[in-house]
Regions:
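Rossmann-like adenosine-cofactor binding region
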Residues: 51-57, 174-266
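Rossmann-like dinucleotide-binding domain for NAD(H)/NADP(H)
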Residues: 102, 222-312
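Short beta->alpha connector loops at strand-helix junctions that form conserved
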Residues: 28, 69-70, 86-97, 173, ...
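N-terminal glycine-/charge-rich "phosphate-binding" loop or analogous flexible N-terminal tail
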Residues: 1-42
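Glycine-rich Rossmann-fold phosphate-binding loop(s) that bind the pyrophosphate
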Residues: 151-152
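N-terminal Rossmann-fold NAD(P) dinucleotide-binding loop
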Residues: 155-156
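Phosphate-binding beta-alpha-beta segment of Rossmann-like dinucleotide-binding domains, i.e.
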Residues: 92-145
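An anion/phosphate-binding loop that grips the pyrophosphate of nucleotide cofactors and donors
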Residues: 42, 60-63, 193-194
Length: 312
């Protein structure tokens, strides 16, 4: 059996390939043009973000199993996999703790103006007239309202941590829904009443560019936006404009629509109220270890004829 990982460099820990008897190939990265040659003859493909679409899958008759080394699997054409009887598994829950803690860290950074004051300290404090600097307004976390979009494992974990800090937590119903489920508020109410909004929903045709000029204009003027889910949830041109114009108070993003971003991405501009990190909210040591373990568990289960964590 041939097993190929297409983007091994995305994992800071190596897969313990000796646990499963197979012909392993761990490729650092694989361009779109090289996917078919790389997977020719392979029974199992492992991918973190390398896309596997219908036009690629039809050229790989021996491929039987795809393990996505992540929780989100929007890089896989599930319909094409079903048509070709290719099983697909993901690794759910591996980063729940890491991502939820990253969100709380972002809330502190934004509300307490840590980025701005770190800069002020070096430039202005030595010339200050007294013991402290008063520049940007600092806001408390306790008592603030956190709106969460997506009530999966990570969304609920963020909610629990936020409540422990004294925050008021509300979960948004799906945009455009005519029915509000128990435990939710309407999407529009969440926008209008939240001090911080954190995105934790999958990327789909229904959620693509969920946050755009219109939704940004419905948020509180001081509200702050956090996205650790998928970059495509946000219209990046609209967000950059909103931050420049002060439509909202700030944002913290760990994901962008294209990764790595192109140099002309508007969110790479000088935006003092934006905290941008390179898709590492998931990557605590324990998060990475959980992911590696989950990948190996999925492959072992497939080899034994009892696949787990199937998404198709």
């Amino acid at each position: 059996m041939k097993i190929v990982m297409l983007d091994g460099e995305t994992l800071p820990l190596s897969l313990p390939t000796g646990q499963i008897q197979a012909d392993w190939e761990i490729r650092p990265q694989t361009s779109a043009n090289d996917v078919v040659p790389a997977l020719t003859g392979a029974t199992v493909a492992i991918t973190n973000k390398v896309a596997l679409r219908a036009e690629t899958l039809e050229k790989l008759p021996e491929l039987r199993f795809i393990c996505v080394a992540a929780t989100g699997y929007d890089c896989i054409d599930l319909d094409a996999c079903r048509a070709r009887d290719i099983l697909v598994s993901n690794v759910p829950g591996y980063s729940t703790q890491s991502v939820s803690e990253s969100v709380i860290a972002a809330i502190f950074a934004l509300r307490r103006q840590l980025m701005a004051y770190a800069l002020n300290t070096r430039i202005d404090w030595p010339q200050a007239a007294h013991f402290c600097l008063h520049r940007q307004t600092i806001q408390d976390i306790a008592g603030a309202t956190l709106g969460i979009v997506g009530k999966g494992d990570i969304g609920q974990a963020v909610g629990r941590l936020a409540q422990a800090l004294g925050m008021q937590v509300q979960y948004a119903e799906r945009k455009g829904s005519d029915r509000i489920r128990e435990g939710y508020v309407s999407f529009e109410q969440m926008l209008a009443t939240s001090d911080i909004i954190s995105l934790h929903c999958p990327l789909s045709e229904q959620t693509r560019q969920l946050i755009d000029r219109q939704t940004l204009s419905q948020m509180k003027p001081h509200a702050q936006l956090i996205n650790t889910a998928r970059g495509g949830l946000i219209n990046e041109d609209d967000l950059a404009a909103a931050l420049k114009q002060g439509v909202i108070g700030g944002a913290a993003l760990d994901v962008l629509s294209s990764e790595p971003p192109t140099a002309d991405n508007p969110l790479l501009a000088d935006l003092p109220t934006l905290l941008l990190t390179p898709h590492i909210a998931w990557a605590s040591r324990s998060g990475v270890e959980n992911l590696v373990s989950g990948v190996m568990t999925n492959i072992a289960a497939f080899v034994q004829g009892q696949p787990v964590n199937l998404v198709n």
